[in-house]
Structures are given as structure tokens and as C-alpha cells.
């Protein structure tokens, strides 16, 4: 199973980070951050569907998507061409991301008014704190890899630190867990993380089950304006698009076509 392998492959890296920067010291550094996180929920509300544009170099299914990968340059293009938030993949082994990419984007100022979402396989409170330290305003939490108790723990900690959570589901049972945890931003992942197969009808099936007070984000497999129009008709608030953008020769032109 791909999801399980990704989590396992990253455990040694997490332990090394804990050794280099113990939790107590990490917590001190986070408390000293002078500026509050940008509210991603506010950025995703509106009449028109919003775009979360993803900084993504590679994936397990496609390999390297963009050889000439410059995360700061890509984030700047996103910020100038209508993105409402920027997702930054930080998983190293399968997506070739890094926490340093997140930090570089935040410190560069190219997207100073947009929330940054750390997209990774987060399962430990340590990762929540380090997300804030490296400049994240929000984090991804994947229900498929978390117990209900751990999901609630990570949600509570994130909110304590002022960060929003995109809580990702793929099935009805996962959606029920997310709603029971009082998640307010629900990500409907059209990709099965166990097989990496895409099915856009996932959003179609699950969207009607989500109460109106939640913000709904459709993720994965979104390639064209027609895809977005279809999802907009289903009542989603935002779409998360990565591969279709970073694989484009002209990212700005692709964004204009999508929006």
C-alpha cells in the first residue's frame, strides 16, 4: 500500500529531526514567532471557486513533474495569477519536497498575503509545531492514516497555534470521522492514497453529505476548466491543483485557463 510505505519511509527522518531539535526547544521557538498565521478559511470563502495552487516537484505515480523546479519562483507565479492559497509539498522521499521549500517561500515574501498549507503525511504533534516554525499557516491532516483520537489531538493543537487544518477524506466513513472531529475545512481527495487511482466522482458522492458551515475543497485529478466548472456546480468552495500547473510550460497561462 502506497500510503503506508510513504509513512514508514519518513519515520527515520522525523526521529532525526527530533534529535537535532528537541520538542521543548521547538515549542519555545514557535512561541517566539511574532506574527500570526494567515487565516486560510477566510481566503477560501466567496462566490467563485477558489484555487489552492500546489508547489510540487514529483509524485509516486508520475515521477519528476518539473525538472527545472524553483519553489519560490512557482509560488510567486501562483500569487500573481489568482491563487487564494498555496500548498507546499514537504515530503522528501516520494514527492521530492522539503520543509526548506516552505521556509524559502515564506521568507521570500513572494506570497506574503496568501496562506501557506504544509502538505505532508502528518501524524505526530512534533510535525504540527515544526510546520508553524517553517512558516505554515495551515496543515494537511489525512483521516486515512490517523486514529480518530490522534486526528482530534492534532486538530486541537493546530488551532491552539492559530493554524487551520485541511482534513482530507476519500470515503464516506472517513468523512464521518472528520465531521465528528468538528473539522471545518474538508478536503475530498479524488485519489485513493492506497492505490493512487483517480476518480472525480468521489467529490460528487461525498459533497452532499457535508453541512453548509464547512468549507469544501476538491483535490487531485483536476486538469481543465471543465473539471473545475463541474466541481463548482457540485458546490465545492475550492480546488487544489498541483500537477496540472507544475507540469505546464507556462504556469501563468494554465492558471488563466483554469480560472
From Swiss-Prot:
Q: Which reaction does it catalyse?
A: 1-(2-carboxyphenylamino)-1-deoxy-D-ribulose 5-phosphate + H(+) = (1S,2R)-1-C-(indol-3-yl)glycerol 3-phosphate + CO2 + H2O
SUPFAM superfamilies registered for this protein in UniProt = Ribulose-phoshate binding barrel (SSF51366)
Keywords attached to this entry = Amino-acid biosynthesis, Aromatic amino acid biosynthesis, Decarboxylase, Lyase, Tryptophan biosynthesis
Task: Name the Pfam families for this protein.
Answer: IGPS
**Entry's transmembrane regions:** none
Which EC number(s) does UniProt give?
Answer: 4.1.1.48
Q: List the disulfide bonds.
A: none
Which GO molecular function terms does the record list? indole-3-glycerol-phosphate synthase activity; phosphoribosylanthranilate isomerase activity
Q: Record's InterPro entries?
A: Aldolase_TIM (IPR013785), Indole-3-glycerol_P_synth (IPR045186), Indole-3-glycerol_P_synth_dom (IPR013798), Indole-3-GlycerolPSynthase_CS (IPR001468), RibuloseP-bd_barrel (IPR011060)
- Note the Gene3D superfamilies from the entry: Aldolase class I
Using the UniProt record, name the top-level EC class of this enzyme in a single word: lyase
Indicate the family of this protein: Belongs to the TrpC family.
- NCBIfam families attached here? PRK00278.2-4
Q: What is this protein called?
A: Indole-3-glycerol phosphate synthase
Give the organism, scientific name: Dehalococcoides mccartyi (strain ATCC BAA-2100 / JCM 16839 / KCTC 5957 / BAV1)
Q: Which gene encodes it?
A: trpC
